[in-house]
């Protein structure tokens, strides 16, 4: 009995429908990801007239840097920031800090 339950659990984790993919423009239900940014946190906020933190962070334009690696601390004041995260900017699209959500892009001088 327990082995059948374990097999079913393992099988359900392997199915592609149970995987989450955030790199696409729409969800599996066809909802644009931009709608999720506005609605996800807003449902937990008491004052819905204000913008959610996810909406505020998405309005900040990507920060252009010269090098390939950027060190994100979240704020200029270390007491208000987060642990330092080194982000590699090898891709053409902006890289996102996992703590604060700031986006960084390499500034190509071509």
Swiss-Prot record:
GO cellular component: mitochondrial inner membrane; mitochondrion
GO biological process, one term: mitochondrial electron transport, NADH to ubiquinone
Pfam families noted in UniProt: zf-CHCC
Subcellular location: Mitochondrion inner membrane
Keyword Membrane in annotation: yes
Topology of this chain in the membrane: Peripheral membrane protein
Coiled-coil stretches noted in the UniProt entry, renumbered to this chain: none
Keywords assigned by UniProt, alphabetized: Electron transport, Membrane, Mitochondrion, Mitochondrion inner membrane, Respiratory chain, Transit peptide, Transport
Family: Belongs to the complex I NDUFS6 subunit family.
Subunit structure, as described in the record: Complex I is composed of at least 49 different subunits. This is a component of the iron-sulfur (IP) fragment of the enzyme.
Stated role: Accessory subunit of the mitochondrial membrane respiratory chain NADH dehydrogenase (Complex I), that is believed not to be involved in catalysis. Complex I functions in the transfer of electrons from NADH to the respiratory chain. The immediate electron acceptor for the enzyme is believed to be ubiquinone.
Protein name: NADH dehydrogenase [ubiquinone] iron-sulfur protein 6, mitochondrial
């Amino acid at each position: 009995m327990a082995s059948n339950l374990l097999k079913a659990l393992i099988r359900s984790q392997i199915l592609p429908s149970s995987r989450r993919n955030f790199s696409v423009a729409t969800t599996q239900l066809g909802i644009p990801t931009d709608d999720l940014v506005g609605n996800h946190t807003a449902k937990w906020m008491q004052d819905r007239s204000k913008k959610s933190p996810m909406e505020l962070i998405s309005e900040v334009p990507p920060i252009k840097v010269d090098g390939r690696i950027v060190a994100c601390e979240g704020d200029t004041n270390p007491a208000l920031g987060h642990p330092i995260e080194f982000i590699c900017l090898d891709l053409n699209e902006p890289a996102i800090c996992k703590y604060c959500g700031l986006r960084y892009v390499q500034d190509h001088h071509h």
